[in-house]
Amino acid sequence: SWIVLDNNKANLARGTRVIWEKIDRADFKLNKINTNSILKNIDMHLGLVFHRFLEGINLKREKLKIFINGSEVEPKNPFNEESNATIKSAISTLKYNNSDIFVQYFILPHEDMVSIEEWKNFEGEGGYIKNQGCYVYRCNRLIVSSTWFGIMPKLASTKLCRAKIDIGNDIDSDWKIDIKKSTASPPKSIKNFLTELIINNIERKGRGVVNKRTQELIQDKDLKLWV
């Protein structure tokens, strides 16, 4: 049965309240620390999956606001696009069955090029090595994150590499998108393009940023030994 509750956000002219009860495998009764950890993970997940809606960028609508227990969810853009130290490629437009697919890659700044806070903000749950890879957006909602689609393994030397892929809702079957909109696999022609892009551009530039900084540190250390 449905239960209608008064919205305690009296200043909101309109909105939607989502009430989750009896969540499978989530035991909020254990202790406060466990509950806070679960809520933090939910906040991070929603902030990442819906970050474009929360940012309100390039959308033909006002930006979305999500509250968890009264606290507003902040967008978790994984690409650090505002940093001058981030390497950003041009946007590639691919035609597939009369549908446009947009691809852009980013090499995030080395740890020594940003503040500790900024480094942590874009690390993501599990760290940089885990969160490298492609991020697929379907109509601006993130449906797949941090995967190279089997094209290459996740290595420390490419931990700063991320790519965003935008697709519409008219090629779901081609991308093998499931009913939950939580998995996707690129068609062969698109994967061939991604393979060439990842191997010849993304991997090479990502390794270059990491290796260059490592070499600089080695040289600095050698110089100091001679002082």
Enumerate the language-model features and the residues they cover:
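Charged regulatory segments coupled to nucleotide-binding catalytic modules in large multidomain enzymes
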Residues: 38, 87-227
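A short, hydrophobic secondary-structure junction motif
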Residues: 44-48, 69-73, 134-139, 172
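Short linear motifs in intrinsically disordered
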Residues: 44-59, 80-84, 116-128
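Accessory nucleic acid-recognition modules appended to NTPase machines
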Residues: 51-98
